[in-house]
From Swiss-Prot:
Membrane topology: Multi-pass membrane protein
Gene: vps10
Primary location class: Golgi
Regions crossing the membrane: 1386-1406, 1441-1461
A Pfam short name: Sortilin-Vps10
Cell compartments where the protein resides: Golgi apparatus, trans-Golgi network membrane; Prevacuolar compartment membrane
CDD domains with a match to the protein in the record: Sialidase_non-viral (cd15482)
Protein name as catalogued: Vacuolar protein sorting/targeting protein 10
Residue numbers on the Lumenal membrane side: 25-1385, 1462-1528
Residues with glycosylation annotation: N308, N735, N899, N1006, N1244, N1295
Function of the molecule: Functions as a sorting receptor in the Golgi compartment required for the intracellular sorting and delivery of soluble vacuolar proteins, like carboxypeptidase Y (CPY) and proteinase A. Executes multiple rounds of sorting by cycling between the late Golgi and a prevacuolar endosome-like compartment.
Protein family membership: Belongs to the VPS10-related sortilin family.
BNR repeats (start-end): 62-72, 105-115, 450-461, 494-502, 749-759, 1136-1146, 1179-1189
GO biological process, one term: Golgi to endosome transport
Length: 1528
């Protein structure tokens, strides 16, 4: 076996002991080096006897240049500096020693000498590919590292083209790893220049840290920027003609490049393959059948040792507690996979019992689970493993036998040595530990050593017991050492005749060891071996040399021709279409080859093709007669089948394909037998859709569901990376009656075609399901809670169901109050926390948190908990160093056993195994929203609440509210949607039942410093807030404010609606619509206090699960409301909509109608609300410009709901209602309206079916919002085409230069009457020295200016109001500060001349930009018309502004504006070489001091007011099934 990877380990100090060499010529010689710590990461330089290993305890490197006989510490590297050792993948003379700093070490002479090199980045401890090497130019290396500032980290990629002789250069911002295209010697782009320079990088999504938004970009000039700053790169069309988001991994496999993508709502991944990085195709897997699936799931697929002609892949299908898989082999292009073997054995790390026989084509060994079906149904069942071998690359499999008996072999999942498990480059020689019998037994109790010298066809028992083993001199020597758990091994064994006879040899000095590894050179051509073992607390590196055994070198007469496969007469037969013949020393020859580092050369001869050279093609499978029959659609060749032509013909596969890599010569018979045959276009993959009829279709399901008062329904929405196109819904009927008479719930139904066909799920017939709980982020998974310990779940949207038991029953009383027993991890669907109710006696019960990673094994996390939550996530872990993926927060009672004791917030980053820390005491509640963790604690003396915030779950800072914002006896906070890098925190300022109201505060980027966004915001008695974000657009939201907060208690609230387009910095009234077909409005205006459009808010809606907008329809919003001076009664409301993000509105219907948006906003359907019986719906295909009616029922019915997928991507809708026969559903299908797929041409949008929509701010005509101009794609209204993929709506984003609009008032500052941020009277500015403490790597801080940068802005350059005052050094960084700010003469020239020269220009700038720049970003209640008094066209403003411009510039603006301009000039000077410078994801969460928990992660859950799931459906307003309009 050869050393390939790291060895586990501990530490090392050496004193060498030399055992006296044995005198006899027929004995090997031994030399022993004694160490006091374990050698780690032993690596040979290929083609040499030079070895390195890493002392991880003392952080040193050791080197031997004589195959391990002598060792010494590398002297060129300072003691204790080596953190990791990397060998160059493609140059056998180079290696790299990475340190914990930025100075590292490299060698180009196999470790004789080492040179330093520096990289401006730290190494990422969680990456294995820190260094990525170019396959043909060893000087070209990519360094993937980290830049960290405190606990905030970002990944960076740098490159060198001269082996770090000069400093490495950064590639581009926002990288998550980069790779050379030429990552494998056999891969090529087809262009030598591209092979040399092409780089692929995964980059962050636009304004997103989530994996589903990541992208793949390619550059051929190191991502250099042009003169305008645009990076020279392109996004490849992974999906054939369009890019794909969600790129999470890139891998080079021989001649293939593989890209894995993920998406929201699913854990299924998509694989895209290219053989040149130019043309990409999605990997296609055959249709699933029988009892297993064929989808690729995150962390559940393994790329096996592949070949130059196909990819071999193992896909996990079983539970992670008992993992099994299916092995697939691709065609030559790597795109179409066929199944080889099911129930392959693998372990929880994804290692598969699979290994090819080295050097021989088409042979590999596998272990499979013989009772796989039983294990799949019950994961606790013990696996029964059997070994099989294939000689035709997986087409067929044979048993492994020794002396006529079946044997089973320990493989990759039970590694006991390093390197390959079974074979080496020694031709045909294979060794393995195993046993005879029906199944694989225990390694220690049952295993013996077996040997094969015919590549695994026949085996013989060699030695008793399990052994570590190696091959030398191309198989002339076999060496083995008995494996043991104890330090009791005193000898080795070796064989010189292919394992027929063995000789035992004692270790020197009566040494007894516990063997650890036995290894030799990677090519197994040498006569020297290294054995490492442990004895009496020390480690021994034993060098074994067989040089003296045979002095003779083999002659031609000592050699034989060995054929990889022979017939019964000993004649060579064909494997993979050819014979394979190797020169090999005869078994009994008394000589050594002594051809170090030279492998045996194989001779091949092609054979004529036979049936054995063919296998079933993609989506074909052999039947009982051995004939390949179709199991699914057939690939259509490129260019065949015109669009819309389902009846056309094409030449497609016969159902057979030549085994990839098979080189047999075609014969006339095989050509005729396996030639392509004529197929129908309608039977192919991606077949044209049925011809469009232009008609709306519907499918009714009536009289099937019975009579119930409510529906419980769950859309299990698929992701973009899902391989199927199903639209799955799970539902059941429910009864909510006053006297609880009759059944409470009905049977569970499932549809996969959006309601066309419903099937009853019989799996639950013996179980009473209390609650149906879809996973909040991975919609493939659904959990079904029962009253006892049994929990049922499906990992694939209801195709299969499994069960497991939880440790204790749920506390359903607590669940009714919002504390739910099942808590999910956002990234890992099988990571669960269960809150169980444990009772010592009837009256002594407490809550215990249990954790599991697979549902089978549960560990106690914490006792006496109130609730727990996963706060770790892959996205946050990359950004915040302390926020581990395993991070959990719990509210736990301070005194164990005392449920009345105070709660404290505790955290753990390791499932509470070793790490448990108290973060805050007297905690009342906590909530997570986007990246923020917000905690409410109680001031026990003042009986008020305090808010704390954290980004990493470790450091919590108290929220600082603005001066004067004093609320006595605070009892409730509500964390609103905070997806724009700032917390929107609602603080209740009046808590008087239906008179309650409060203030929305907006935080800085770390959630700790707050300013007022809007006051007197309406809420209800439960502190649910009239706040609604527009989905898919940043910073757009609606609120309802109370305009009579001081009215008498008997007076009803008077509400008005306001909108913000810049994340709460400004609020304006909604403009009134124009006169329409329904009549006049009572008034008309652009939106004023006296006349505006007002929309019913969140607290007034009956069905709080409904949102105003849809993720798929950017800028489109609906609502019920009225025009006037305030919001009227909901009974008098009409239905309004906007298509431009709230700039303009129109009335689409009198009265209240329910809406649903499909096909990414191009289909809109309206139906009357419940209680208004109808037989008609209305729809629009042009964004509401025109409407058409459709009669869907012969009788008037009561429509309870209208639904479609939440993403808005579907062309199907579902009406839920009640008629005379009971409950019914009607599917409304728009797929027949067109068969034309919308065309997207990013290079020429005029030829595209899409147009650009750019949201505007009504007060900012330049189009810059949050420092950039965003452009979104929307389908052109009225076009008859459909979206066949989820369009990434964000088309482009261009940053603007920074202006006043990109800054808001800092803490303790407020807007004065001039629109400037002034210090509140009597207060001091925030001590900005705290910046130095919070950011220990910073060297300077700025005096406060009163302004701070808006967290969401991305502006660059221009004015910097935040850093416009004096700058000072941070304590301890005075020298660094001095070096940075040392000013040259030319810079002084700029400092003096520029302000004077700019003064008059600034005066003009002040005048020209008064409207849009000064006084417009404010955090208050002013509407669109509040600045009219200061309009620049007013005579009392225009001339004074011009007259006073110079004074403003030189006096008032000098400290601020010119300070910002100075920095602009300074950065420009530095660029010239002058000077010496250096869509929201969440919902709402409530923090309630009253003790009731409200854990709201999604808008659905908040809508229900019951946490993440509920026993009842989302229509929470209809508790008793009443239909009164008053119940809102």
């Amino acid at each position: 076996m050869r050393v390939r990877g790291a060895l586990q380990a501990a530490a090392l100090l050496a004193s060498a002991l030399w055992a006296a060499p044995l005198l006899a010529k027929d004995h090997p010689t031994f030399k022993t080096t004694k160490l006091d710590t374990q050698p780690n990461n032993l690596n040979y330089f290929e083609g040499s006897d030079t070895i390195l290993f890493h002392d991880t305890h003392k952080s040193n490197l050791w080197r031997s240049d004589d195959a391990g006989a002598t060792w010494s510490v590398v002297k060129d590297i300072p003691d204790g500096k080596v953190a990791r050792l990397y060998m160059h993948d493609f140059d056998s003379k180079r290696a790299f020693a990475i340190t914990d700093g930025r100075k590292h070490y490299r060698t180009t002479d196999q470790g004789k000498t080492w040179k330093t090199f520096e990289v401006d980045a730290a190494w990422d401890t969680e990456r294995f590919d820190i260094l990525h090497f170019h396959a043909t130019d060893p000087d070209r290396i990519i360094f993937n590292g980290l830049h960290c500032l405190g606990f905030l980290c970002e990944e960076v990629s740098l490159y060198t083209i001269d082996d770090f002789e000069t400093p490495a250069k950064p590639l581009r911002p926002d990288t998550l790893g980069c790779w050379w295209a030429k990552s494998s010697p056999v891969f090529t782009t087809g262009d030598s220049d591209l092979d040399k320079d092409r780089i692929l990088c995964i980059i962050m999504g636009v304004d997103s840290i989530f994996s589903e938004d990541r992208r793949l970009v390619i550059s051929d000039d190191f991502f250099k920027a042009d003169k305008e700053g645009n990076i020279q790169e392109f996004e490849p069309n992974l999906a054939g003609d369009k890019p794909v988001r969600g790129v999470v991994n890139v891998a080079a496999v021989k001649r293939y490049f593989m890209v894995a993508t993920t998406s929201a709502n699913t854990d299924e991944m998509a694989l895209f393959i290219s053989t040149d990085t130019k043309k990409w195709q999605r990997a296609m897997f055959p249709n699933a059948h029988d009892d297993h699936d064929h989808k690729i799931v995150q962390e559940a697929y393994t790329v096996l040792e592949s070949t130059n002609y196909s990819i071999q892949l193992n896909v996990m299908t079983g539970s992670k507690s008992a993992p099994m898989g299916i092995m697939f082999t691709s065609n030559y292009d790597g795109t179409y996979f066929s199944e080889n073997l099911e129930y392959t054995n693998l372990n929880m790390f994804g290692h598969v019992d699979f290994e090819k026989i080295a050097g021989i084509q088409g042979i590999f060994l596998v272990n499979k689970v013989d009772n796989g079906k039983e294990v799949d149904e019950k994961p606790s069942t013990k696996k029964k493993l059997v070994s099989e071998i294939t000689f035709d690359d997986g087409r067929t499999f044979d048993k492994v036998t020794a002396d006529g008996k079946r044997i089973h072999l320990h493989s990759v999942t039970e590694l006991n040595n390093v390197g390959r498990v079974f074979s080496s480059p020694a031709p045909g020689l294979v060794m393995a530990n195993g046993n005879t019998g029906d199944y694989l037994g225990d390694y220690w109790e049952d295993a013996n050593l077996y040997v094969s010298d015919d590549a695994g066809k026949t085996w013989k028992k060699a030695l008793k017991g399990p052994h570590k083993y190696e091959f030398g001199d191309q198989g002339s020597i076999l060496v083995a050492v008995r494996d043991s758990k104890e330090e009791d091994i005193s000898e080795i064994s070796y064989s010189l005749d292919h394992g027929e006879n063995w000789v035992d040899e004692k270790l020197p000095d009566d040494l007894k060891i516990q063997p650890w590894i036995l290894t030799t050179t990677p090519d197994s051509t040498g006569l020297q071996f290294v054995l490492i073992g442990k004895a009496k607390g020390a480690w021994h590196v034993i060098h074994i040399d067989f040089e003296g055994l045979h002095e003779a070198t083999c002659k031609e007469s000592d050699m034989e021709e060995w054929h990889a496969r022979v017939d019964k007469d000993g004649e060579p037969t064909c494997i993979m279409g050819h014979t394979q013949t190797y020169p090999r020393r005869k078994k009994d020859a008394k000589c050594f080859l002594k051809k170090e580092f030279k492998l045996a050369e194989v001779e091949t001869k092609d054979c004529d093709c036979t049936d054995q050279d063919y296998e079933c093609d993609y989506n074909f499978e052999r039947n009982d007669k051995g004939i390949c029959v179709s199991r699914g659609p057939i690939p259509i060749p490129e260019g065949a089948c015109k669009e819309g032509d389902r009846n056309g013909k094409f030449l497609g596969t016969s159902g057979y394909r030549k085994i990839p890599g098979n080189t047999c010569k075609d014969t006339k018979e095989t050509k005729d037998k396996y030639k392509d045959v004529e197929r129908s276009c309608g039977d192919g993959i991606g077949a044209p859709p049925d011809e469009a009829t232009g008609e709306l279709q519907q499918v009714d399901t009536k009289g099937k569901f019975g009579h119930w008062t409510h529906w419980e329904k769950h859309y299990l929405e698929r992701g973009e990376s899902s391989s199927d196109s199903s639209e799955t819904i799970i539902m059941r009927g429910m009864n909510r009656t006053v006297d609880d008479s009759g059944p409470k719930v009905g049977p569970i139904w499932r549809t996969t075609d959006h309601g066309k066909k419903w099937d009853k799920v019989d799996f639950f017939k013996d179980d009473e399901v209390i609650s149906i709980v879809p996973h909040p982020t991975v919609k493939d998974w659904v959990f079904f809670l029962t009253e006892g310990k049994k929990l049922i779940y499906t990992p694939d949207r209801g195709k299969r169901f499994r069960t497991f038991e939880v440790p204790q029953p749920a506390d359903f009383e607590a669940a009714a109050n919002g504390i739910f027993p099942l808590i999910f991890h956002p990234d890992k669907p099988n990571w669960l926390i269960w809150l169980g109710k444990k009772c010592e006696s009837k009256n002594d019960c407490y809550r215990v948190a249990y954790g599991t990673k697979d549902g089978e094994r549960w560990e106690t996390l914490a006792r006496d908990v109130y609730r727990c939550e996963f706060t770790g996530a892959e996205a946050y872990g990359r950004k915040y160093a302390n926020r581990a993926l395993e991070q959990i927060l719990c509210l736990k009672h301070e005194k164990e056993g005392d449920n009345d004791s105070a709660l404290q917030l505790v955290s753990s980053n390791d499932w509470f195994n070793q790490d448990e820390r108290v973060r805050l005491k007297e905690a009342k509640e906590f909530a997570t929203m986007a990246e923020f963790i917000v905690v409410a604690t109680e001031d026990t003396e003042k009986k008020t609440l305090r808010a704390y915030a954290s980004l990493d779950g470790s450091l919590y800072s108290e929220a600082k509210f603005p001066f004067g914002f004093e609320v006595p006896h605070q009892h409730a906070y509500t964390v609103l949607d905070s997806s724009t890098h700032a917390v929107n925190l609602f603080v209740a300022t009046r808590m008087e039942g239906d008179k309650s109201l409060g203030t929305i505060l907006k935080s800085n980027s770390n959630g700790t410093s707050y300013v007022v966004s809007v006051k007197n915001v309406n809420c209800d008695q439960y502190f649910y807030v009239d706040f609604e974000k527009m989905v898919g657009l940043e910073g757009v939201a609606l609120v309802n404010v109370v305009v009579n907060p001081d009215a008498k208690s008997s007076a009803p609230k008077k509400l008005q609606t306001k909108i913000t387009h810049n994340d709460g910095a400004q609020w304006a009234y909604l403009p009134t619509p124009r006169k329409d077909e329904f009549g006049k409005f009572p008034c008309s205006s652009s939106g004023t206090e006296k006349c505006a459009l007002h929309i019913q808010g969140y607290t007034q809606r009956r069905d709080r699960g409904k949102t105003y907008s849809s993720e798929g329809a950017v800028g489109v919003m609906f609502g019920w409301g009225n025009v006037g001076d305030s919001l009227g009664s909901i009974k008098d409301a009409d239905t309004f909509m906007t298509t431009d993000a709230g700039i303009t509105w129109k009335r689409v219907k009198k009265g209240r109608w329910n809406w649903a948006l499909g096909d990414q906003g191009s289909i809109i359907v309206l139906v009357p609300i419940r209680g208004q019986k109808t037989d008609t719906l209305e729809y629009s295909l042009d964004q509401g410009a025109t409407w058409k009616k459709h009669t869907f029922s012969k009788e008037k019915v009561d429509i309870w709901d209208l639904t479609t997928t939440r993403s808005g991507n579907s062309q199907n809708f579902l009406i839920w209602g009640e008629n005379s026969d009971g409950l019914f559903t009607t599917k409304i299908d728009f797929t027949k309206f067109t068969d034309h797929v919308c065309k997207y041409d990013p290079e020429n949008l005029s030829k595209s079916d899409y147009q650009i929509f750019s949201p505007k701010h009504p007060l900012q005509p330049d189009g810059c919002l949050f420092g950039h101009v965003s452009q979104y794609l929307r389908k052109k209204p009225g076009l008859k085409c459909f979206n066949d993929f989820r369009l990434d709506p964000l088309y482009s984003k261009q940053n603007c230069t920074c202006t006043r609009s990109d800054f808001e008032c800092d803490f303790n500052y407020e807007l004065d009457k001039h629109g400037q941020c002034s210090l509140v009277s009597g207060l001091k500015p925030k001590d900005h020295k705290l910046w130095c403490k919070e950011h220990p790597d910073e060297i300077e801080y700025y005096e406060p200016t009163g302004f701070r940068r808006i967290p969401l802005t991305t502006c660059q350059g221009g004015l910097d109001f935040e850093k416009a005052a004096a700058v000072h050094p941070c304590p301890g960084h005075e020298d660094d500060f001095e070096r940075k700010h040392r000013v040259s003469g030319i810079a002084i020239f700029f400092a003096v001349v520029l302000p004077v020269a700019a003064a008059s220009a600034i005066g003009w700038w002040v005048y020209r930009h008064w409207d849009g720049k000064f006084g417009q970003i404010r955090l208050g209640e002013q509407g669109a018309s509040t600045m009219e008094f200061f309009d620049a066209d007013r005579p009392w403003v225009k001339y004074p502004v011009i007259a006073l411009s110079a004074v403003v510039a030189l006096a008032g603006a000098m400290p601020l504006v010119l300070g910002a301009l100075w920095r602009t000039a300074k950065s420009t000077a530095e660029r010239w070489g002058i000077g010496g410078g250096g869509g929201g994801r969440g919902g709402w969460s409530r923090l309630d001091g009253g003790g009731a928990s409200r854990t709201f992660r999604t808008r659905d859950s908040f809508a229900r007011g019951r946490g993440d799931y509920t026993i009842v459906d989302e229509d929470e307003g209809e508790l008793l099934g009443e239909e009164s309009d008053e119940e809102v």
